[in-house]
């Protein structure tokens, strides 16, 4: 939700969600659900591309190439399910003559560089790693697990990292 909202706030009109991962349902599915829910609610044109780990990155390159017309990408905002994928997509786009953030804005997800004391390598949705760790320990140490909620949502935040056109 937050990534799509940020991209729209920065002027993007046609968004793309990219994911590579397991075929087993997981957290990145929730990222896609939030992305799609925001886009539908805001009337924003969007597409998604879901790949399995075994597919590798080649299908992303083919998809991106097929969506470049007269030197322009059909999308002006892309949300990738991880920061690592964001950096791979940025590299592919650069090789195809598409620049971030000038031609397309990219946002990743995890923000682990920030928690390691480094500046983010891409604009990202930051997970609250210390709070996540504390919550996990609390759950593990809880004697009576019968009243645990089926879902615990922790607050995420946005951090600019050079792949979006953030106001100064």
Locations of the language-model features?
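Short acidic capping loops at alpha-helix termini that bridge into adjacent secondary structure
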Residues: 14, 46-48, 99-105
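Short, cationic motifs built from Arg/Lys/His that form the positively charged side of catalytic pockets
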Residues: 13, 31-32, 157, 161
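Short acidic/polar active-site loop segments enriched in Thr and Asp
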Residues: 10-15, 73-76
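Flexible loop/turn connectors
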Residues: 65-168
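Hinge/beta->alpha junction and helix N-cap segments in small-molecule ligand-binding domains
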Residues: 1-2, 18-63, 79-87, 109-111, ...
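Secondary-structure boundary/capping motif
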Residues: 12-14, 37, 57-61, 100, ...
């Amino acid at each position: 939700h937050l990534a799509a909202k940020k991209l729209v706030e920065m002027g993007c009109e046609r968004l793309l969600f990219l994911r590579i991962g397991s075929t087993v349902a997981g957290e990145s599915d929730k990222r896609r659900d939030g992305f799609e829910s925001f886009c539908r609610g805001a009337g924003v044109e969007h597409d998604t591309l879901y790949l399995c780990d075994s597919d590798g990155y080649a299908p992303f390159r083919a998809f991106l190439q097929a969506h470049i017309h007269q030197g322009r990408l059909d999308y002006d905002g892309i949300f990738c399910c991880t920061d690592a994928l964001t950096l791979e997509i940025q590299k592919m786009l650069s090789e195809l003559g598409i620049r971030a953030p000038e031609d397309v804005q990219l946002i990743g997800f995890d923000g682990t560089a920030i928690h390691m004391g480094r500046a983010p390598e891409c604009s990202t949705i930051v997970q609250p790693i210390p709070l996540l760790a504390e919550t996990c320990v609390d759950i593990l140490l809880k004697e009576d697990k019968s009243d645990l909620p089926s879902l615990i949502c922790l607050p995420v935040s946005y951090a600019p990292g050079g792949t979006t056109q953030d106001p100064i």
